[in-house]
Regions:
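Nucleotide-sugar donor-binding/catalytic module of glycosyltransferases
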Residues: 1-127
Length: 127
């Protein structure tokens, strides 16, 4: 990426082939453009990463914003999230589970609120 991202989204990937497509599409369809997507493969035994790469083909404008990292061994959620946080380049970091999906304006709204309020942390609920 040529400019610093406003938001880095860390998405752990392990055993979610039934859910990950919906998650990816909701992330790639965000109205906020300056996003770094960090998908971390925790040595998933299923086709989750193949699905990710296939869905990426539908969003060529997002390809340069995507990092796919494979852990050396299955390390668990804490280690995966830590790797993501240590390698994120965005002003803000968001953790998104790979079986979740979000509204298309969610991260833009959260980023704008953080900037408006000068907040270090923004939290939200779900509907």
């Amino acid at each position: 990426m040529t400019q610093r991202s406003k938001v880095s989204i860390i998405i752990p990937v392990y055993g979610v082939e039934k859910y990950i497509e919906r998650c990816i599409r909701s992330l790639f369809e965000q109205t906020l453009r300056e996003i770094e997507y960090i998908f971390i493969d925790d040595c998933t035994p299923d086709k989750s990463i193949e699905i990710l790469k296939s869905v990426m083909e539908d969003y060529p404008h997002r390809k340069g914003q995507v990092v796919i990292h494979r852990m050396e061994k299955n390390s668990g959620q804490a280690a995966v999230r830590r790797w993501g946080a240590l390698n994120a380049t965005g002003e803000y970091v968001i953790h998104c589970d790979s079986d979740d999906w979000v509204d298309t304006k969610m991260y833009e709204d959260m980023y704008n609120r953080a900037v408006e309020d000068g907040a270090d942390v923004v939290v939200c609920d779900y509907n």
